[in-house]
């Protein structure tokens, strides 16, 4: 396991609780994989892995899942976003379940958050070492699911959830030599996504016109 070069974390909204358990186990064993790629919810889990805070991601999802400040239809109606990322990266990370920014910034591990460029439809890999505080905006973009969230501007890019363009990045997609990979999935073996149907297509078109 110590020879692993890259860890890829699939998204999956609240299914990411499984991922947080895997990362907690790695932290408890003292295993620090050099390169970490997070897609959607995987990027939020990756943050606590680099800040070396076992249990943090789990506690957030279990303790705040029913908190309307965190997510919910009322927030969707008010802001066009089901998830309240201002709360996640604000009060939650600074006061309620503090994020260890100092350890994160000093980490020798590298992290990439995957988002989808709304102009090109291609995946963008944002690197924590190159962005400073704006990297957290990239993580927000990585988690912004279409229809349920508004588009997020990262620099000059306009982005949505990374899972649209690259739900599980292939080695050749990565902006660095991947080496030996470990991929944490949040779907069962053999899962195949079904078509979304005409009703969902119509909802997307309506949302696009509003945007």
Task: Explain the meaning of each model-derived region.
Residues 1-39, 47-210:
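Patatin-like phospholipase
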């Amino acid at each position: 396991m110590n020879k692993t070069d890259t860890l890829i974390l699939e998204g999956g909204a609240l299914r990411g609780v499984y991922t947080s358990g895997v990362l907690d186990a790695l932290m408890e064993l003292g295993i620090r994989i050099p390169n970490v790629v997070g897609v959607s919810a995987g990027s939020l889990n990756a943050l606590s892995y680099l800040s070396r805070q076992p249990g943090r991601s789990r506690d957030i999802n279990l303790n705040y899942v029913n908190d309307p400040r965190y997510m919910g239809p009322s927030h969707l109606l008010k802001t066009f976003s089901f998830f309240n990322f201002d709360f996640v990266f604000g009060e939650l990370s600074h006061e309620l379940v503090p994020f260890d920014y100092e350890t994160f910034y000093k980490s020798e591990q590298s992290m990439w958050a995957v988002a989808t460029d709304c102009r090109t439809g291609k995946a963008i890999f944002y690197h924590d070492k190159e962005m400073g505080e704006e990297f957290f905006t990239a993580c927000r973009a990585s988690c912004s699911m279409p229809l349920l969230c508004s588009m997020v501007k990262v620099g000059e890019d306009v982005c949505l959830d990374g899972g649209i363009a690259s739900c599980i990045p292939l080695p050749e997609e990565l902006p660095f030599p991947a080496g030996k990979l470990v991929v944490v999935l949040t779907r069962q073996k053999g899962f195949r996504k079904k078509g979304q149907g005409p009703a969902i297509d119509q909802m997307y078109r309506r949302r696009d016109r509003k945007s």
